[in-house]
């Protein structure tokens, strides 16, 4: 009787793991790539040191399968380069383009003039195009 019980528990667990590992390929991330930032909204172009403001970026996504993944935020002194990334899922999605808004918090720790460069794609010569914004920190 104990042997039958052990075998049934093993069979039950094996069946559970077989079903739980049966993954649906839809909604899996297929690709992550940079997406151009179309525009930027900075509420205050002058702010105090150690205060926080949210900087918003707007990007156009080609379908409902494409969504915001994150930012690459590179600091170099008082200069900031910002590149947005999107991910694409493998699923049944509408192909209508849409504008997505995302943001990040900026909290300066020293006074000065900060220059932000937001990646806006590449030109015909394959050179990066940047949207430049400045924030004066007092």
What do these predicted ranges mean?
Residues 3-5, 14-39:
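Bacterial Sec-dependent N-terminal signal peptides
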Residues 5-6, 136:
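Sequence-pattern detector for short linear motifs
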Residues 1-2, 53:
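General secondary-structure edge motif
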Residues 29-138:
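First exposed extracellular module after export/assembly in secreted or surface-exposed proteins
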